A protein has these predicted regions:
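Conserved ABC ATPase signature
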Residues: 31, 225, 238, 245-299, ...
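Phosphate-binding P-loop
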Residues: 17-23, 299-302
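Conserved catalytic network of the ASCE P-loop NTPase/AAA+ motor domain
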Residues: 72-74, 89, 299-302, 329-333, ...
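C-terminal lobe/lid and adjacent interdomain/linker elements of RecA-like ASCE P-loop ATPase modules
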Residues: 1, 323-400
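Conserved P-loop NTP-binding catalytic core
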Residues: 40-108
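Phosphate-binding glycine-rich loops of NTP-binding sites
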Residues: 24-62, 112, 291-295, 340
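N-terminal pre-Walker A segment at the start of P-loop NTPase domains
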Residues: 1-16
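Electropositive, glycine-dotted interaction segments
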Residues: 90-245
């Protein structure tokens, strides 16, 4: 699990942004332009570190467009991202830090480190496994396989003169024996699953016959492998029944769904009560298809370690939003979730777990995150739902 995240001089997060502790379920509320989506953008950047870091940088308008624009001294800021994540194989969590700036309109990495979160009793500083070291990268290579990962024992510090200045070390070193900590962080971040928007128009990938050579283990960001994921989930004990039970909460007449493979493509069909032939996904309403996508995420028995969803309430009838809240709580026992929402109905469904809600606001120094505290809300919640308290303006995260 991601224990904390700290963003500085990045997008709407200013230079004095503090490390923010994360829980299994984190539902962000706040007005438009407060920075909720920027947190997920930052996680998308981290996800790219074991692959091509420049891809999201380019898609976001170039390196300079990722930098905090609130400075008044005229200097080019240095953006930094720092996360602490659990490391079951080691003795303590790992801290990963990445910092970059702009040089001649190009991204320039100025710092990167992977180290233990805390110092141990015998050290003045945390054991490190990689450090950028002011442009002279150092790797702490494991030379004795008998020593536990996360330990400084049995290590040899080696320079890395040919490291790229535009790509993370996570994309350049992946030996699980020699660099177990780097391999673990890279694999973990690479599995982060982001779902920022689904295009569900008439001729979009989730509706049309889909390629059979796409991955089927988890839903892609554009939902282009929806049929393959459903086909995989159908083979898992009890999962199809769970999907159908939840789907009927919105689509009461549905009796079953099936997947057909024809001519090298795959398509999803729905069997509706009273109809003699199935209905293809091309004929489903946008809301029904969106809900089905959400179900594949939230009912999955073996999801990725972190799943991010932007505004799951879009296109759905308000009556089904309490079910989304229930599904979020259930899914958070299997994975970590970061979700954004503008729905007071969805927030009301979290009244029993108000500590899962994070208020996001834009202040003079940038985006500020603040988690609700259950004890401080007990009197309010004895009379109102959490969504009602939010709309009253007692939680923050309101426009006025």
């Amino acid at each position: 699990m991601l224990r904390s995240i700290r963003l500085r001089n990045l997008l709407s997060f200013g230079p004095d942004s503090e490390a923010f502790p994360l829980q299994a379920l984190n539902v962000l509320i706040g007005p438009n332009a407060s920075g909720k989506s920027n947190l997920i953008e930052a996680l998308g950047l981290l996800r790219a570190t074991p692959g091509d870091l420049l891809a999201p940088i380019r898609e976001g308008g170039g390196a300079s467009e990722w930098l905090w624009k609130g400075g008044t001294d005229g200097r080019t800021p240095t953006a930094s991202l720092e996360v602490v994540l659990d490391y079951p194989e080691g003795g303590m969590p790992l801290r990963y830090r990445l910092a970059f700036s702009v040089s001649g309109q190009r991204l320039e990495l100025v710092d990167e480190a992977i180290e233990n979160e805390h110092v141990d009793d015998a050290s003045a500083s945390p054991d490190f496994f990689y450090r950028h070291h002011q442009g002279h990268p150092l790797l702490n290579v494991r030379t004795r396989m008998t020593d536990r990962p996360g330990s400084a024992k049995g290590r040899q510090t080696r320079p890395l003169p040919q490291a790229s200045a535009e790509q993370s070390i996570l994309s350049q070193r992946r030996d699980e024996d020699s660099y177990p900590e780097l391999s673990y962080v890279g694999a973990w971040l690479g599995r982060v699953s982001l779902h920022r928007e689904w295009n569900l128009g008439r001729y979009t990938p989730p509706r049309l016959p889909q390629r059979t050579d796409l991955p089927g283990d988890f839903l892609l960001e554009d939902a282009s492998n929806l049929g393959l994921v459903l086909n995989d989930l159908m083979s898992r004990r009890g999962v199809k029944q769970t999907l159908l039970e939840n789907l009927k909460r919105l689509y009461a007449r549905v009796e079953d769904f099936s997947v057909r493979i024809q001519g090298g493509t795959l398509q999803v069909f729905f069997h509706e009560e009273g109809l003699s032939a199935p209905i293809p996904a091309t004929r489903l309403s946008d809301g029904t298809l969106r809900y089905l996508c959400l179900l594949t995420l939230l009912c999955h028995p073996t999801p990725p370690p972190l799943v991010c969803i932007e505004e799951p309430e879009l296109g759905l009838h308000p009556d089904v939003l309490p079910d989304i809240g229930r599904l979020l709580r259930e899914a958070s026992t299997r994975t970590q979730l970061i979700v954004t929402t503008h729905s007071d109905t969805l927030i009301s469904s979290l009244s029993e777990v108000p500590e899962s809600v994070v208020v996001c606001e834009q202040e003079q120094g940038g985006t500020v995150l603040r988690r609700l505290e259950k004890d401080k809300l007990s009197e309010w919640l004895s009379r109102y739902s959490l969504g009602e308290v939010w709309r009253m303006g007692e939680l923050g995260g309101n426009r006025w």
